[in-house]
Amino acid sequence: DSNNELIIRELMPIYEKTGIKERPEIWVVMGLFNIASKVQEIIQNCKKELLIALPQGAENIVDIIQATLRTLSEKGVKIAVLVSDDTSKETILTISRVAEVRVKNNMFGGGVIGDINQVMILLGNGRNEKGNVEPIAIWANHIGLTGFAKEYFSYLWSDASSK
């Protein structure tokens, strides 16, 4: 009899669709190492589509993620990379081996969207608890935020030039 009650107690919220909903996570991430680690995690977990907006001055990241991008490309993941107009021709050539690349002038900030279920938005620099200036970003797996980020990326992409 207690088993029946347990089963009913567990299944009734599902049946009534009133169960406790899981809260999406939204994190403020500070520091280059922490941001790079989370970006690498997003890239490594990507299965279908990876969208990257590479901000001004972030060309050194390309060398770090190049091997992972190649692996994803070989697995059939669609990769699109938006770069700022001051990005070197060598960097654009390197990225274009594994991804479709477009150049956008006046691009501010950057980010990474993996499979429309995770996003990292680079906000610029902020001050940590000690008062030191560090890069700051927002990471989320919130469907609304990831959807908005993809829409915005698509808007920038449509206005960018192919190289």
Task: Specify the residue positions occupied by each region the protein language model found.
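A short, well-structured juxtamembrane/interface segment
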Residues: 31-38
